[in-house]
């Protein structure tokens, strides 16, 4: 229907029938109450504003309202007609779209709406990222919570800044207020101030670099001095801050020691001076504060029924031989680690000698032998107590220090024997691994305390045996002629002249006794004093052979083996020898 050059379209729903009915067009007469009331609220607003007068007026003037609506439509169409050609084309496109199927039109408008929403969301996200990046230099925590993950990975925080720009009017007023002659001076002042700031910054940077260079030079010079001292360095992590560091091995693990403390330390760098400090770590790679201990030997002799101190070893070591303090610290830690390992090995051996007058009390090993007491004590090192280190209170007279040299020799013997044990372990590690070598590595015990105690007891056993023989010879001197020959340490006669061979082999000594009776019969008694692998047990092997005449004895012919027996007690062998000699005299 055309009117004034425009056309109107009226849609009659009944013309399509029920089969072709548009689902988006609803018949108001067929709406339910639940659907009708919301539409009325949308069109007429709330029921509170409905009055009888307004309803009557609406009923009386339906045409006036339609004409007003038509006038509004015409006015809007005239305004559209006055638009530009581009707006007219948009209007024609819109009219063309209205001629499409309603479902297609709805889907198209829905797609346009989603695009607009996505565009708005993108612009909002960009704006939020811009603001977040802008405030990141001032409030980084707040910016991290609002910035997008992609921008956070791509752009570092604080990289965007802002400044305040004044208006042109303010600049003009400021320029007018400043005198023309003062403007160059202000600019020169700013430039001069900037130059001073840059100069100071460069000077500070140069000083910092020089300090860093001096620190690094001092650090690496000290590292080089440690390396020049033939120390073993390795890379590690500092347990304090897990930073990379250089460590040093000051222990004896590579020399054959199996002590639990491997002797590892961190050479920590001082961030202020650049110097390195010596910081030991334990087997769990944790920092530890060590208490240094050293071994002291004492000898107490029995005098008038009381045991008095007659000898004490001296602490002989100087930890200031090098001009570098770090070298002195390493040598000091190495010395006390050796002392700690030595006392540990001595304690291991002493536990197996409890039945031989050896006892362990706290940090002290006590050995009772031959009316003397030998004390091996682990003493805390105090470098400020010179009186104790130099035995000032012990050396009060000559008699109280008569055994000082003996104590010093015992201490040196222990240290040398521990070095021999290291060498033995090192040879086992270098051999081809077999079941025997593995067993030896896990079951080997050092020979440090046992050789000393065994040889002391062996000397006492020789004296006791000599006294027994002397008593028996004196008892039968009227009936027998005696000839005695003593061969001490007979097992070492045909060996090399190694002074330590005596310390690692069980001692063996022999007594050869030849007795001649009045009937010219000869009795040969061979006594052998030895021990087992414990070094402290007494084993006496006795062999008795009888000859009828001197010729048989000299030719070692027709000898009769009278007795062959072993003893572990001097009282028993004395009785046996007494009976043997008595039987020989009477027979």
From Swiss-Prot:
The keyword Transcription applies. It is found in: Nucleus. Its main location: nucleus. Pfam families: Med17 (PF10156). The keyword Lipoprotein does not apply. Keywords: Activator, Nucleus, Transcription, Transcription regulation. It comes from the Eukaryota. GO terms for molecular function: transcription coregulator activity. Residues 156-186 are annotated as: Disordered. Transmembrane segments: none annotated. GO terms for biological process: regulation of transcription by RNA polymerase II. One of its GO terms (cellular component) is core mediator complex. Component of the Mediator complex. Belongs to the Mediator complex subunit 17 family. Component of the Mediator complex, a coactivator involved in the regulated transcription of nearly all RNA polymerase II-dependent genes. Mediator functions as a bridge to convey information from gene-specific regulatory proteins to the basal RNA polymerase II transcription machinery. Mediator is recruited to promoters by direct interactions with regulatory proteins and serves as a scaffold for the assembly of a functional preinitiation complex with RNA polymerase II and the general transcription factors. This is Mediator of RNA polymerase II transcription subunit 17. It comes from Scheffersomyces stipitis (strain ATCC 58785 / CBS 6054 / NBRC 10063 / NRRL Y-11545). The gene is SRB4.
């Amino acid at each position: 229907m055309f009117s004034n050059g425009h056309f109107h379209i009226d849609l009659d729903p009944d013309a399509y029938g029920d089969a072709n009915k548009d689902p988006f067009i609803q018949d108001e007469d067929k709406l339910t109450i639940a659907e009708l009331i919301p539409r009325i609220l949308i069109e007429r607003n709330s029921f509170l504003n409905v009055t009888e007068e307004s309803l009557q007026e609406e009923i009386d003037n339906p045409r006036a309202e339609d004409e007003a609506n038509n006038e509004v439509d015409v006015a809007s169409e005239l305004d559209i007609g006055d638009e530009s050609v581009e707006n007219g084309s948009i209007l024609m496109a819109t009219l063309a779209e209205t001629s499409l199927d309603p479902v297609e039109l709805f889907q198209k408008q829905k797609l346009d709406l989603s695009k607009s929403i996505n565009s708005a969301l993108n612009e909002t996200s960009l704006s939020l990222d811009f603001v977040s990046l802008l405030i990141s230099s001032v409030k980084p925590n707040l910016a991290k919570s609002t910035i997008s993950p992609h921008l956070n990975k791509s752009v570092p925080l604080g990289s965007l800044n802002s400044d305040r720009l004044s208006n042109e009017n303010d600049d003009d007023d400021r320029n007018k207020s400043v005198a023309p002659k003062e403007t160059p001076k202000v600019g020169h002042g700013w430039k001069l101030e900037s130059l001073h700031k840059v100069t100071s910054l460069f000077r500070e940077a140069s000083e910092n670099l020089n300090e860093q260079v001096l620190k690094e030079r001092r650090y690496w010079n000290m590292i080089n001095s440690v390396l020049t001292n033939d120390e073993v360095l390795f890379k590690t992590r500092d347990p304090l801050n897990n930073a990379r560091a250089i460590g040093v091995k000051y222990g004896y693990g590579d020399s054959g020691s199996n002590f639990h403390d491997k002797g590892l330390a961190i050479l920590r760098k001082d961030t202020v001076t650049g110097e390195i400090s010596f910081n030991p770590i334990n087997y769990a790679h944790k920092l530890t504060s060590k208490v240094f201990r050293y071994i002291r030997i004492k000898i107490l002799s029995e005098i008038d029924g009381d045991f008095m101190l007659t000898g004490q070893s001296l602490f002989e070591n100087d930890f200031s031989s090098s001009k570098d303090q770090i070298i002195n610290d390493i040598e000091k830690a190495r010395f006390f680690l050796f002392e700690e390992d030595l006392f540990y090995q001595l304690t291991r051996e002493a536990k197996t000698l409890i039945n031989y007058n050896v006892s362990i009390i706290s940090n002290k090993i006590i050995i009772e032998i031959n009316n003397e007491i030998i004390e091996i004590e682990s003493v805390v090192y105090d470098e400020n107590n010179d009186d104790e280190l130099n035995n000032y209170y012990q050396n009060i007279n000559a008699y109280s220090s008569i055994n000082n040299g003996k104590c010093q020799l015992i201490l040196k013997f222990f240290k040398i024997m521990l070095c021999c044990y290291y060498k033995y372990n090192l040879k086992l590690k270098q051999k081809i691994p077999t079941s025997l070598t593995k067993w030896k590595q896990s079951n080997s015990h050092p020979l440090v305390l046992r050789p000393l105690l065994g040889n002391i007891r062996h000397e006492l056993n020789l004296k006791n045996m000599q006294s027994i023989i002397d008593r028996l010879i004196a008892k039968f001197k009227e009936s027998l002629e005696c000839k005695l020959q003593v061969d001490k340490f007979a097992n070492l006669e045909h060996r090399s002249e190694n002074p330590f061979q005596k310390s690692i082999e069980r001692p063996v000594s022999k007594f050869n006794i030849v007795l001649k009776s009045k009937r010219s019969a000869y009795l040969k008694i061979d006594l052998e004093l030895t021990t087992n692998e414990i070094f402290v047990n007494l084993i006496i092997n006795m062999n008795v052979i009888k000859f009828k005449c001197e010729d048989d004895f000299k030719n070692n012919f027709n000898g009769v083996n009278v007795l062959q027996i072993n003893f572990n007690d001097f009282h028993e062998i004395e009785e046996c020898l007494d009976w043997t000699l008595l039987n020989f005299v009477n027979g």
